[in-house]
Amino acid sequence: MAPALLLVPAALASFILAFGTGVEFVRFTSLRPLLGGIPESGGPDARQGWLAALQDQSILVPLAWDLGLLLLFVGQHSLMATETVKAWMSRYFGVLQRSLYVACTALALQLVMRYWEPVPRGPVLWEAQAEPWATWVPLLCFVLHVISWLLIFSILLVFDYAELMGLKQVYYHVLGLGEPLALKSPRALRLFSHLRHPVCVELLTVLWVVPTLGTDRLLLALLLTLYLGLAHGLDQQDLRYLRAQLQRKLHLLSRPQDGEAE
């Protein structure tokens, strides 16, 4: 195992990379489609119909490229989450296992965003063009995106984000406190095993609620929706535990206010 002087910078570097990737993901999924950052190619009149698009190489080739990028991300994210790979990584990297997983996921997502090919000439599933929809639909989408991202950040705070990012494992190791998961209750461990993506609904809102749902955006939203759906396995016991934890967090947050009122 590497000394603490190497473990801490490695975990911090992974966290910074993940944070920067998250900021870039907000730009990629929200700011670009909402603020018109997608390059145009002749406007709506130049777009192909659905049947014509199936024979247009200028549409099929970038879609195939985008599909490959998404499959690369999904493959990395799923493969490194398997027990076999996690055991191998824990054996050779120790407490940096989670940080390495987070860093690799961030790099895979960076590849998707950096090399993503828009398809401006492809057909669209829907598009707000005529007034008043051209004004109000983007505004409504913007509001829903802001709410969704605020909820995502709030949920990450309710969950143990330091452990999700791999920081807590290194912190506990340096202080000799053991494995953080070993201190959690069986109900919490059961929840974490079922809920790999605690912000599923909010991410789906960000992916689908856009003024113009073009071909490449449809591919992105559809594939990630399928992936999130397959990875989401909550049951009633998990929901009861989540509700109890949320009430506990709210009670703790309200205690200082109660003290001031007294």
Swiss-Prot record:
> Which stretches of this protein does UniProt put in the Perinuclear space compartment?
29-58, 115-133, 211-216
Organism of origin is Sus scrofa
> What is the similarity comment for this entry?
Belongs to the nurim family.
Read off the InterPro entries from this record: Nurim-like (IPR033580)
Domain of life of the organism in this record? Eukaryota
Q: Does the keyword Transmembrane helix apply?
A: yes
Which residues point to the Nuclear side? 1-4, 81-97, 165-191, 235-262
A GO CC annotation given for this chain: nuclear inner membrane
Primary subcellular site in the record, as a coarse category = nucleus
Question: What is the recorded membrane topology of this protein?
Answer: Multi-pass membrane protein
Can you say where in the cell this protein is located? Nucleus inner membrane
Which spans are transmembrane here? 5-28, 59-80, 98-114, 134-164, 192-210, 217-234
Query: What is the name of the protein in this document?
Result: Nurim
Alphabetically sorted, this entry's keywords are: Membrane, Nucleus, Transmembrane, Transmembrane helix
